[in-house]
Amino acid sequence: MTRVRVRGIYATALTQLLRNAGLDVVAASPPIRARFPDADLGAAEPHADIRMTPDRQGVGITAHGDDHARAVRAVVADLPRDTFVWPDPVPRGAVFDAAVDHTVGGGAILDLGDDREAYLPFGAVDDHVTDGDTLRVAIRDPAPPWHDDRPTATSTITVSGALASLDRGVDALVAGAATDRAELARATELLDPDIPDNWGVYWEYDGADASLDARGTALDTLAARADRLEATLADADGGDTPGLVAAPDTTLWAWFGRETRCALDDHRRTVAATMPGHHRIKAGSDAASDAVDFAEALGASVDEFPFGAVTDQFGPSVGASIEIQHGKPDGALISLGRGEVTDRSAENARITVEREMTGGGTYDALGVAREAGDTATTRFTEGNWWYPTVYRSEDGERKGTYLNVCTPVEVFPDAVRYVDLHVDVIKHADGAVEIVDREELQDCVADGLVSEELAEKALSVAERVQSAVAE
C-alpha cells in the first residue's frame, strides 16, 4: 500500500481523492486530521510526498520507487482534462557530478550534463567554487517546468523523510528542526538504529509527535534507502564529465487548470464546507487564500464563483498591469508580456487587456508586418476555452484577429493563465477565416502531452469559433 503525505491548499481534496483510490495518507497536518476524524492519518514515513508549488498552480510529487510514483500519478492524472503531469529530469534527491559553468551573485550555475542545469548557493557548499570546478552535488529543491528558476543543489547528500532525514557526511548523530532535540536524542539512542557509517540523523518537526515505534520504523526505512544510495555512489567514480550518478526518487509536476480546481472543490465539499471557486480563489494569492478561509468559517454562501467580488478585492482592476502567462503542453511557460486592463465586466467575468507592440517580424499565421505602435487588444473571459486578440496599426487599421484555443482561462490578480492547445482560428483583415496548427496539436497527442479527449475538445472549440466569426 502506498503511503502519501500531502501539504498545501489542495491537501483536503487530495486526501479524500487518494483515500478513495485506496492509498494511505500519513503524517497529516492537524487541520486535515480534524476533517477526517475517523481516519488513521498519523505519523508514519510516506512513500510519496505531494506539496503545493510555490505559485499555487499545482503540486510537486516526489516518490521513493517507481511503483509508488505510478500509483500517485494514476490518481492525479485521473483528474479532469486540464491537468498536465510531467516527469522532472532533475528530481529531488538526485546526485550529479557537476561542473561550474559560471558564478553569479550568491552562487554558481552548474552544468549537470544533457542540457540540465542547477543553481548552487555558495552557502550550500563548504569549499570555494569557481568557473570550471567539478564537484558532486544533490538536488535539494527541484523546480517546476513552468518556472524560470533552476533547481537548487547542495553538496550535502540527503535521504529525506517526513519524520526524519539522514545526511551523509554529518558528524552529529542527531540534529534537526524539531524543538525537543534532547528527547529525540534519547529516543534515537534507545532505538539504536542501524544507520550507515558517516550518516547522521536529522529529525523533522513531524518526528517530535510520532510514537517511538513510528520513529524506529522511519529510521529503519531511511537507513535502508541510505544503504542503497551508498552502494550506488560507491560504484560511481567521480569524473570531470557532468552527468547523473543516482536518482533514488522520482519527481513529477502537476499543473492544475480551472476544471481541475472545480473538481477538487467537489472532492473537498464531501468532507468540509467549500464555497464555489475555493481552490481557484486560493490559487490567486496568500490574501485571497486567507479570505476564503474567513468566508467559509462565517458560513458565507454563494451560488457560483464570485468573479466580481474576487477581482474587486484582489484585482485586477481597470488600469492595472497584468501579465499573460501562456503555458504549453510540454510544461514550458511563455510570457506574452504585460498589458493594461482597460475594461472589466463582473457580469460577464471578463477583462480587456491592451498591449503596445514592438516592431519586427510578422504576426504568427496572419502574415502581416508587426510594426512599432501597433496595439493588441485581448478579451479574456474567465472559464472560456478560447480568447480573441485584435491587432491594429498605430492609426487604428485592423490587421487581423487571432483566436487562441486553450484550457479554460483563469484571471488571477497578477496574471492571466492557461495552457495553449496549439490549434487556433485566424481571421484576416479581408475577412477570411481559417483554422491553423492542427498538426501541432496532433503531434502533442502522439507525444503523450495532450490526451485524445482534450484534443477533441480543442478541435471542437476551434470549429465552433470558426463558424461564429465567419458569419
From Swiss-Prot:
Q: Which GO terms describe its biological process?
A: rRNA processing
Question: Signal peptide location in the record?
Answer: none
Entry-linked Gene3D superfamilies: FomD-like (2.40.380.10)
Which InterPro entries does the entry link to? Answer: DUF402, FomD-like_sf, Ntdp-like, RNA-bd_FAU-1
* Entry EC number(s): 3.1.26.-
Citing just one GO molecular function, the answer is: RNA endonuclease activity, producing 5'-phosphomonoesters
Instruction: Look up the domain of life of the source.
Output: Archaea
Q: Which UniProt keywords apply?
A: Endonuclease, Hydrolase, Nuclease, RNA-binding, rRNA processing
Q: Please name the top-level EC class of this enzyme.
A: hydrolase
Which residues are in the S1 motif domain?
A: 93-139
Write down the SUPFAM superfamilies for this protein, in alphabetical order. FomD-like
The similarity comment for this entry is: Belongs to the FAU-1 family.
Record's function text: Probable RNase involved in rRNA stability through maturation and/or degradation of precursor rRNAs. Binds to RNA in loop regions with AU-rich sequences.
Name of the protein described by the UniProt record: Probable ribonuclease FAU-1
Question: What is the scientific name of the source organism?
Answer: Halobacterium salinarum (strain ATCC 700922 / JCM 11081 / NRC-1)
